[in-house]
Each structure stands twice: as C-alpha cells, then as structure tokens.
Amino acid sequence: EFGEAGLDHDLIEQSSEEIVLMQSGCLCCSVRGDLSKTVVGLLDRRKDSEIAFERIVIETTGLADPGPLMQTLFVDHILAKTTRLDGIVTVADAANGVATLDAQFEAVSQAAMADLIVLSKTDLVTPQKVKNFEKRLRALNPSVRIVHAVRGEGLTDQIWGLSVLQPKAEKKDVLAWTLGETPQLDPLANLSGFAPAQKLSAPIPTHDTRIGSASIVLDDPIPSAAFDLCIETLISIRGPDILRIKGLVFLEGFDAPFVFHGVQHVFDLPVQLKDWPKDDRQTRIVIIARDLSRPELQRSLDLLRTHTSTPLPAS
C-alpha cells in the first residue's frame, strides 16, 4: 500500500491465506527491497512447514508502475530461482477509466503491460461506453485478454495460469498470449499497424499517443546468435522505453518453440514448449513501448527478418 497507514488488510472479512503488509511506501519504487525480503521470508516459512501455499498474490497501490516489480522478480537471484511471474492483472474502472487514462500515465502503463484486464463497474455504464473503453484498452495492448466483473464475482478461475512460460502450456493459451484479438478501431493505427488509419471524432489523449506497439511474424527459423543480438541491441538502445516485449520464437536447431518476455532491459528466462501451438511453426513477437514511433519499433523487429535469410558472419 502507498503510505505508512495500511488499511486494505483490515477490509478483508475472512482469509485463510497469509497476508503481509508492507508500509514503507510505494511498491513501484522504495519497497522493492522489502518485496524481496518479504517473499523470501514467506518461502522460508513454507520450507519450515509453518505455512503452506502455492501462489503469492501481490496487490499494489493504484499509483504503481508494474515494470519495476516485474524487474525485481526477474533479477533478484533468489526470487528468479524460486518464483515465476504468472501474470499481471489490471483492474480497470469502466465508469471512470477513460478519465483515469487521460489523467494518469501510470494507468496507461498498467493497461499496456497487463496480461489480463478486469473491467469493473460495467453494470453502472451503458454497453456502448464499455465497448468504447475496451477499444481504447486494446489500442494500448492488442494481445490483452479482457473480462467483465460485477462486484468481483466469477473471477476466481480467470486470474490464475496466465503465463505460458511453462513447458506444458496449453496451445490455445500460447496463441492468445502472443496474438490476442485484432482491434477493430485503433486510434494508434499509425503506431501499431493493427488497423488502418481512421478519422477520429475527438483528439487522441496525450498519454495514449506515447504508447505504441508493433509485431512481426516470421516463417523461417532464426539463428540463436542473431536473435540474441537483435534483442540485446534493442534493449541496450531503448531499454527504458520498452514496456513489454514477448513472443513465441522458432530457433534454428530446435524442434519446439521458445516463449519469452521482458520488461525494459530485464528478461525472464525463456522456456521451451513441448510442441507448437499451430502447424505453421511461425515466430511471433509483440513489443509495446513508450515514446517510440511505429517505424522505429518495426525496424528493430525487422532485423530478425534479415537474419532469417542471411547467415551470420563467422566469428
């Protein structure tokens, strides 16, 4: 929670799970060290049979940027070995979400980096307003899954198992994770390439124009060295602006694909799947970034296209 006086833990009516409150500040900045210590402490207590659990749920303040949290899980040497990020769930208020996106760039980042967006208060607004809000969210994050919730009902089975970074991931989940739905109206069409440009009746909100996305699909296998070089070049030059990059990759010399994802300059370990989710054996990569134009994003990804047809020089 943000601030020294914690409140949310007192509002839970009943819980059999372990609740840990960190009061030293905003999770996106000053308490990242506390996060590591807290999670390690929970793991130690589980090892000593004091408590039993399978998952750890981290609820941040609405002011938080998910990026630093994800980086902590990736780079902390203990957490990287003992935990795996299952996914980012963002709750978006259907009644006030548009105003929040206009006013708070943190909200834009939360939407752009989410694996799942839960729309709340959909019963308080018209279906058309919900539809328009979903279109705006998909413009920020084309591959995100969006579900509706009224008073939190029906969510229990939908917020788990979001990550496909596991060998036994379901084929349909892998495809949804890398492709998502193609937006019908994209106010960022000049950036994302997911839809043709359309004349808008209102100006695009300033925060939204800072977020762009691009994708690439490749039929031929990529040399491992070429893939590493292209990704390392991208993150070394524009790492701080990369909100998220993820993909399904066909590497030379491997029968099954790898899935990977990263935030800014930090990447989780790639995981090889047991099989291809489709018969086409295509590499699919999606990148969501801040303050990068569509041509810049596409040029970075097109380096991979070059290396699928041109052998790397011998070292």
Regions found by a protein language model. Give the residues of each.
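Residue-level signature of catalytic and energy-coupling elements of molecular machines
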Residues: 1, 35, 59, 88, ...
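Nucleotide-state-sensitive switch-loop elements of NTP-binding domains
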Residues: 2-100
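Helical mechanochemical/support elements of P-loop NTPase systems and associated helical scaffolds
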Residues: 3, 27, 31-34, 65, ...
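Short, flexible active-site loop motifs that bind/organize anionic cofactors or intermediates
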Residues: 25, 120, 217
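Small/polar loops that bind or transfer phosphate-bearing groups
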Residues: 31, 58, 121, 219, ...
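Short glycine-rich or small-residue beta-strand-to-loop segments that form or flank ligand, phosphate
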Residues: 57-60, 117-119, 215, 285
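Conserved catalytic-core segment of NTP-binding enzymes
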Residues: 69-143, 148-152
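C-terminal accessory "lid"/substrate-recognition subdomains
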Residues: 109, 116, 124-283, 290-315
